[in-house]
């Protein structure tokens, strides 16, 4: 690092090396790169809202419960004859309930 001497001479060279003026020495500027430290930013999460509604859903047809269906009040079991048996029983009639 080099410095510049800004002291002025005190006039004619005295026999005793003394001076009453201030003497300042200035050095070159220093450059320092400061990396920013990691910053943690917390973003708020989404706000989930629900609006529950009490709704009744009904049907006028019979519902399937387990493996037993009802056709005109007579219980039908799917065990033994499978879907093909249901098809032959209801062929030509109305659709099966959903």
Curated annotation (Swiss-Prot):
GO terms of molecular function: structural constituent of cytoskeleton
Sequence similarity: Belongs to the avian keratin family.
UniProt keywords, alphabetically: Keratin
Superkingdom field: Eukaryota
Lineage start: Eukaryota, Metazoa, Chordata, Craniata, Vertebrata
An example Gene Ontology CC term for this record: intermediate filament
InterPro entries tied to this protein: Keratin
Protein name: Feather keratin 3
Species: Gallus gallus
Subunit organization: The avian keratins (F-ker, S-ker, C-ker and B-ker) are a complex mixture of very similar polypeptides.
